[in-house]
Structure formats: C-alpha cells, structure tokens
Amino acid sequence: MSTNVRIFSWFTLSLHRYYKRFMIMNAWKKLIPDMVAVVMFAVISFVYFCPAVPEGRILSQHDSVAGIGAGQEHSEYHKRTGKVTRWTNSIFGGMPTYQMAPSYDSANCLNGIANLYHLYLPTYVWYVFAMLLGFYILLRAFNFKVWMSALGAIIWAFSSYFFIIIAAGHIWKLMTLAYIPPTIAGMVLVYRGKYLLGGLLTALFSALQISSNHIQMSYYFLFVMFFMAIAYGVQAFRENAMASFFKRTGVLALACLLGVCINLSNLYHT
C-alpha cells in the first residue's frame, strides 16, 4: 500500500511540474509577438536617426543649449566639490537651482528604471522608442491586436509635433508625453479588475512622468484621469457595481500617491 502511495505521489508531483512548465512556456509564447513588436520599435527608432547617431552627430537644440549654459556654474561646482548646490549666480543675478535639471536621492532609483525601459538606447533614439512603446502599451491595454497596436504606436510616435519639440530641445515635455499613455493603460487595467498589473503600471509611469519634470503636462493629464474616472463611475452606477468602482479607484489613488511620494523632494520645491 505504501509503495502504491509513493508511486501515486511521484506521478502527481511530476504531472504538476510538467503542467507548470507547460504553462510557463505557453505564457512566453503568448509574449513573443509583443517582444517582436518591441524589437521592431527599437530598430525603427535607430534607423530613423541613421547615420547621424552612429556617426556621433549632435542635434543643436536651442533649449538644451540654453539649459547647459544656465547650469554651467552648477556643473563646475559639482565637479570641483562633489556637492550639489541649490543656488546659482548666473541667472537673474542669483536664483535657486531647484528646477534646473533637478536631482534628488529619493528619485535617483527612477533613472535606472527609465534606462531599462528605454533599453539603454542612445540619445535621440530612445526619444522615439519611448513614444512608440508607451502608446503600444496603451493600445494593448484596450485589447487591440498586436499588429493594430504596433501600427497605432507608429502613427502616434511619428506625429510631426514630437519631432518639432525634439529639435527645439523640449525634452522634459517629450518625456512626460511619452509616459502619459502607459499611465492611462494602468488606469484602464485597474478599472477592468487587473489590480496588480494596472496598479504597478500606474505607479511606475506616474512616477516617471513626474520625474520628467514638466509639471504643466502632468497637470493637464490630471484632467484626463478625472474625466475617465467619472466615465467609469457612470458605467459602474448603471451596472450597480459602485462597490467595485470605489475599490478600483482606491487602488488607483494609492498607485498615484506612490508615484507622487517618490518625487516629493522635487515637488516640494516646485
């Protein structure tokens, strides 16, 4: 009897292991089209800036050049002392540097996450890649097929306005705009009951968005979130599902609060 029990236990355990492996392999197979799309975005972004990026050319961006000039004293002080100064004498006879390329220890972790999200692509290349990937995530959250999402992302990313602000050097605005679509994706997923994935996306991209330091764009985006929440609330009211609506709204509020708290040092001085 004990031998039969051991054989049965071994068989059950083996079956369970093979089932887990099958499920993992199946999950990876489902992700293959999305991974192909991401690689395609990286290739498209790189090809668009060829041969300029491989040859090391630098785009003369007015705002970026002005920013470098304004922060020259700040940079030299940091190189000389290793400390970060919060004051400069080079603008308006002296002013705080809180919003001149702000850097705070509490938000430094986001730099590594952002680089990973951009696949460590070169400057200029990752600008377009971030626009492509962000809108792709949004369309996938709306359950569009892979090819439709990829096409929509390309149409979005290659809007003329984005290249105008790249040329002008409005990089903080571009970064913020790149992180808004995936933040909306997180919101959509939460209201569809995918609390963990949606909450993580909302927290991550709201943090990255605020860290991009273009509060004006983030402020405008708050209105989008507000009206989307109203729309989901009306839908929940019609379906007598207000309890679920408040629960999901609470998850979103916590996710957004986390994104804000990570950037609190910067926001405090804004």
Predicted feature locations:
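Start-transfer (signal-anchor) and selected internal transmembrane alpha helices
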Residues: 3-50, 243, 247-252, 256
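Transmembrane signal-anchor hairpin modules in multi-pass inner-membrane enzymes, especially those
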Residues: 9, 17-27, 31, 60-66, ...
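Membrane-interface starts of transmembrane alpha-helices
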Residues: 32-36, 115-123, 144-152, 198
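Transmembrane signal-anchor helices characteristic of membrane glycosylation enzymes that use polyprenol
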Residues: 33-70, 255-269
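Alpha-helix initiation and N-capping motif
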Residues: 40, 71-72, 84, 103-106, ...
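Membrane-interface coil-to-helix junctions
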Residues: 45-138, 142, 154-181, 213
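Membrane-embedded helix bundles of polyisoprenyl
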Residues: 132-141, 147-236, 248-270
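Short helix-coil transition/hinge motifs at the ends and kinks of transmembrane helices
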Residues: 238-242
